[in-house]
A protein has these predicted regions:
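Pocket-lining segment of extracytoplasmic ligand-binding domains
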Residues: 174-267
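Conserved C-terminal helix/tail region of periplasmic/extracytoplasmic solute-binding proteins
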Residues: 304-332
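Bacterial N-terminal signal peptides that target proteins for export
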Residues: 1-6
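Short, glycine-/small- and polar/acidic-enriched structural segments
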Residues: 23-161, 167-170, 186-192, 220
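Secondary-structure end/capping motifs
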Residues: 234-313
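Soluble non-cytosolic domains of exported or imported proteins
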Residues: 60-63, 78, 141, 145-146, ...
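N-terminal signal peptide c-region/cleavage motif recognized by signal peptidases
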Residues: 14-19
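Short, solvent-exposed loop/beta-turn-alpha elements that line the ligand-binding surface or hinge
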Residues: 50, 115-121, 213-219, 285-295
Length: 332
């Protein structure tokens, strides 16, 4: 592995040269976020270019990136499983060809003064921490999105009603920490780097952490998957092989070179405080798998989350996910 990685780094260090015959493909992303770290590394380090792929990654918000794949506006997307599983359950033809984050990353953050008044401490068992949230006001990035569904998932499992027992307001991610600091909300549900920023700058307390393994039944969890229409990889198999090989190179690089990975993020997110970015990377990096292989269990966990969290209807449950997972592009 070390010899292979050294050779790969040498190759991409020589100007990221692209041949005149490079194939252009579009891999849409739904937003800019740390969870797309493998995609950023593959692009920045030239892992796709050295294979003759020119990968364009336009931002197409939310589920729009999945719809772009279906309509032919994009060849691929890397996205959370929610909209994809729902589309497949509703009969849309999509293949899951890889996983690049396999740990659930969302966290509940409370203001320190709010947490201090609750009847339990942050180290109490999960059920007690969830039940203590009755009456708390939360900010989420979108109603019916992943953060809201995480609230519904946990309250549904531990005896609260997310629609009656807590207050939920939509808050843009960039406004979550300021809203917490201004005491407009008691807490929020989101991921890195905002949860860390709340702890650092707004007297926040991590109350429940998917990153730290507080919800073990959600592991493994296919948190970021890459999808395509089946015919894309049937008709252009070499393109799918090259795309996933580049993402595998990125996984290897992330685990082998933490400092180099930080430099990629620093270039991608120059506006972010470097200390916070480094902290956030230390949290996200362990959630990056060693292989792009998609585990059936990880998709089943994502489906269960969607069913309990209200992202999927009960009659949309898929019984066998194996027919929708294509691991033939995984480097063995």
């Amino acid at each position: 592995m070390k010899k292979w990685l050294a050779a790969a780094l040498l190759a991409v260090g020589m100007g990221h040269a692209v041949s005149a015959s490079a194939q252009e493909v579009t891999l849409a992303l739904p937003t800019t976020s740390l969870v797309f770290l493998p995609n950023y590394v593959a692009a920045d380090r030239g892992f796709w270019q050295k294979r003759g792929l020119e990968v364009k990654s336009p931002i197409i918000s939310g589920a729009g990136s999945s719809n772009a794949v279906l309509s032919g506006g994009a060849d691929f997307t890397t996205i959370g499983p929610g909209s994809t599983l729902r589309l497949i359950a509703r009969g849309q033809k999509l293949s899951i060809i890889g996983t690049t984050v396999d740990r659930f990353l969302l966290e509940f953050v409370l203001r320190k003064d709010v947490a201090a008044k609750l009847p339990v401490k942050p180290d109490a068992d999960l059920a007690a921490r969830v039940r203590a949230l009755k009456g708390i006001s939360f900010g989420v990035d979108s109603i019916n999105g992943y953060s809201h569904s995480f609230l519904r998932y946990l309250t549904g499992r531990y005896g609260l009603d997310a629609e009656r027992d807590v207050v939920v307001s939509p808050v843009q991610p960039g406004s979550l920490v300021p809203s917490l600091a201004a005491k407009r909300i008691d807490g929020f549900i989101y991921g890195q780097p905002w949860s860390l920023q709340a702890v650092n700058d707004a007297d926040g307390v991590i109350w429940i952490s998917g990153v730290a393994g507080d919800v073990p039944e959600l592991a493994p969890f296919a948190y970021m998957i890459t999808i395509a229409k089946p015919e894309t990889c049937q008709q252009r198999r070499a393109v799918c092989e090259k795309l996933m090989a580049g993402l595998q190179d990125a996984l290897d690089f992330i685990h082998a070179d933490p400092e180099g990975t930080f430099e990629v993020l620093r270039r991608k997110l120059p506006q972010m405080d470097q200390g916070l970015l480094r902290q956030a990377l230390s949290v996200v990096r362990p959630a990056i798998p060693r292989s792009t292989e998609t585990k059936v269990e990880a998709i089943e966990k994502a489906q269960e989350f969607g069913l309990i969290g209200g992202m999927m209807a009960a009659d949309e449950q898929v019984k066998d996910w194996r027919i929708y997972i294509d691991n033939s592009f995984v480097r063995r």
